[in-house]
Amino acid sequence: MQILLANPRGFCAGVDRAISIVENALAIYGAPIYVRHEVVHNRYVVDSLRKRGAIFIEQISEVPDGAILIFSAHGVSQAVRNEAKSRDLTVFDATCPLVTKVHMEVARASRRGEESILIGHAGHPEVEGTMGQYSNPEGGMYLVESPEDVWTLNVKNEDKLSFMTQTTLSVDDTSDVIDALRSRFPKIVGPRKDDICYATTNRQEAVRALAEQADVVLVVGSKNSSNSNRLAELAQRMGRRAFLIDDAADIQEAWVKEAVCVGVTAGASAPDILVQNVIARLREFGGGEAVTLEGREENIVFEVPKELRVDVREVE
């Protein structure tokens, strides 16, 4: 059985930054550090940080006065930000800079009183945070997930309308929704390209190349990870058996028993140690040496806040 690895896969710059913010805060200030929502959607990462003293909460009211609070990589609404500001808290923002860029687009539309449409998945924390940047009662903020949603949407003024997208969507699905928006609202204005981030786009491109060669695809990522789910869906659409797994223990031998080639990738919030564990498990099932496919090089780095720019090893 051949083992192929998608390239790129795993951590993106926004996830790296968010985890570093929590790790550095723990090293500098000591436990406990409070984090609103899971800092990234990965069980292994969250459990590891929890063991070191991070406390994950959903409501600001759960944070005691004088504590350190970190916003997750998914971002928060303006209401949450204001609530935190009204409290005696030291706040660090781990929102991915590419999510912040979308927040700024929404805030700009809100100031102008222009209506905005967000393409995204209802209930996802990134969507809640992005929708929460809009506050102008003269305009309006709407969420659509599919072309069908677009055709049933009613707005106040079709001449002053813009759209944005969640950063972790399916590139293909989003293109279909944008086509519907432009057809329904010919004067709608959007970003030069959609707001789907480079890492999401690159990992979908990589899993497409992987699925062309593999007959089974394993996606390492947690069930609540939007970008990981999109990778598994894409492989399935290409006619491959694809499974979303948290770690190597989830793999069932029956999935790969008849496989000639198994492809492995990982969502943007999944650490490489989980991929290595999956490779080891596949080798127990008769897999050979893992071969990494050629792919797009990524060299983007997002800096942590200057107050947290320390060598954690020195602090420890």
Curated annotation (Swiss-Prot):
Q: Could you say which residues bind dimethylallyl diphosphate here?
A: H41, H74, H124, S225, S226, N227, S269
The active-site annotation reads E126
The entry marks the following residues as binding [4Fe-4S] cluster, namely C12, C96, C197
| Oxidoreductase is among the record's keywords | yes
Q: What cofactor does this one take? A: [4Fe-4S] cluster
UniProt GO MF annotations: 4 iron, 4 sulfur cluster binding; 4-hydroxy-3-methylbut-2-enyl diphosphate reductase activity; metal ion binding
Secretion signal, residue range per the UniProt entry: none
User: Any S-S bridges, and between which cysteines?
Assistant: none
Q: Give the keywords, sorted.
A: 4Fe-4S, Iron, Iron-sulfur, Isoprene biosynthesis, Metal-binding, Oxidoreductase
Q: Where does isopentenyl diphosphate bind?
A: H41, H74, H124, S225, S226, N227, S269
Which reactions is this enzyme annotated as catalysing? isopentenyl diphosphate + 2 oxidized [2Fe-2S]-[ferredoxin] + H2O = (2E)-4-hydroxy-3-methylbut-2-enyl diphosphate + 2 reduced [2Fe-2S]-[ferredoxin] + 2 H(+); dimethylallyl diphosphate + 2 oxidized [2Fe-2S]-[ferredoxin] + H2O = (2E)-4-hydroxy-3-methylbut-2-enyl diphosphate + 2 reduced [2Fe-2S]-[ferredoxin] + 2 H(+)
Pathway given for this chain reads: Isoprenoid biosynthesis; dimethylallyl diphosphate biosynthesis; dimethylallyl diphosphate from (2E)-4-hydroxy-3-methylbutenyl diphosphate: step 1/1; Isoprenoid biosynthesis; isopentenyl diphosphate biosynthesis via DXP pathway; isopentenyl diphosphate from 1-deoxy-D-xylulose 5-phosphate: step 6/6
> Function, please?
Catalyzes the conversion of 1-hydroxy-2-methyl-2-(E)-butenyl 4-diphosphate (HMBPP) into a mixture of isopentenyl diphosphate (IPP) and dimethylallyl diphosphate (DMAPP). Acts in the terminal step of the DOXP/MEP pathway for isoprenoid precursor biosynthesis.
HAMAP family for this protein: IspH (MF_00191)
* Similarity comment: family membership: Belongs to the IspH family.
Assembly and interactions?
Homodimer.
Q: What is this protein called?
A: 4-hydroxy-3-methylbut-2-enyl diphosphate reductase
Q: What organism, scientifically named, is this protein from?
A: Salmonella arizonae (strain ATCC BAA-731 / CDC346-86 / RSK2980)
Q: Which gene encodes it?
A: ispH
